[in-house]
Amino acid sequence: MLPVEPHLETWSRRPSSRSGRPPLLFIHGGYTDGWCWTPYFLPWFASRGWPAHALSLRGHGGSAGAGMLFATGLDDYAADVERVAGTLKEPPILIGHSMGAAIVERMLAMHPVRAAALLAPVPPTGLVPVAARLAVERPDYFAHMMGLDPMRLSADVLEALRPFYFSDRVDRDILQESAKHLANESPRAILDLSMRLHWLKPERNGAHLMVLGAEGDRICTPQDVRATARHHGVEA
């Protein structure tokens, strides 16, 4: 792990009145930052009585650490989540998407977690089979992702990525804002995600766990989601 503890960008939406419900902490996936939770997830849960929080992992969004991004691994990201969780009034429920779900899995094995949800998680076999499938089925998407440069996003790149990351019903303004939050990802973290077959049998330390995916997801298929659920001994 890296020795530094960089400044981390956070967002919070709180209920209008006390509900007694524990806080939620959302962890984003790769190639983006914590802003992705702000249009829908944070306000939706806050309006229903859940204190909702999100962070940008180091090297993403407004968080520091971009200079060391190339050497940043999942354990470093897990340390970021642990730091932010420690600032909350009580232990949060962790909710991670894709790479963020893998970070949550790391934390489940490290120490007790109140409860957790894995949204469209990287499957137990890692990223390599996923990348191989996409290279065959959607070479246009695969080529764009391999050469993604967030500073030079062309219209054809965004059009190729849209059906993989956004609903057809997404608001155009949110779609355009989302493009501003695309970012490079750590090669070390991608390697960690690619080597998941070498992980030990996962430990949940008694935590309640939900594994959730979407039927129309073109990257994390329903089969991938069910494989992760079986890996943890739960139903998707």
Model-derived regions, located:
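Active-site glycine-rich loops that stabilize anionic/oxyanionic intermediates
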Residues: 29-33, 98, 215
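The serine-hydrolase catalytic nucleophile loop
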Residues: 30-42, 223
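Conserved alpha/beta-hydrolase
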Residues: 44-66
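Active-site loop/oxyanion-hole signature of alpha/beta-hydrolase fold enzymes
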Residues: 62-92
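Flexible "cap/lid" loop of the alpha/beta hydrolase fold
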Residues: 112-148, 187-196
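Alpha/beta-hydrolase
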Residues: 151-207
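Short beta-strand/loop motif that positions the catalytic acidic residue
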Residues: 205, 211-213, 217
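Conserved alpha/beta-hydrolase "acid-adjacent" motif
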Residues: 218-227
